[in-house]
Amino acid sequence: MTIWIILGIVVVLIIAVIGMYNSLVQSKIKVDNAWSQIDVQLQRRFDLIPNFVETVKGYMTHEKETFEKIASLRTSWANANSVSEKAELDNQLSTTLKTIMAVSENYPELKANQNFSELSEELRNTENKISFSRQFYNDTVTMYNTKLQVFPSNIIAGMFNFKARDLFKAE
């Protein structure tokens, strides 16, 4: 009789460990998926930028330094691997694009340019998608990181080497 009780407890513990492990794996996959959604939108924005810069360059001749910074950020972003690196570069690029948009107010002929208007609208839409994706990613990471820290899943997370993820911080 005692052997059956011990065996029952062991089976319940094994099932609990498997359940917690699977829950952690599912959460990790959700985090990876949420990151890929941000990555897609960031790539879309980086793909729009060369056309935007070419459109603006002819009008904003005094902004050469800004355009060089954008080119440098694009190169750095292509080589960035971690979430924190990409978040930092994204923040710098967002600030630079806001500067260009603000300066464009001083160029009425640029604002009247159809290509500029269309690209500006596409960039704004992409920025909104990035913002939404960032929020979803951070929510998903928060849930995942919470699972890594609460008992008893923290024990399973430690046993199977699950690591906390960084939030995508915007400035």
Task: Show the residue positions of the predicted features.
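A helix-centric hydrophobic-segment signal that preferentially recognizes long
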Residues: M1-E171
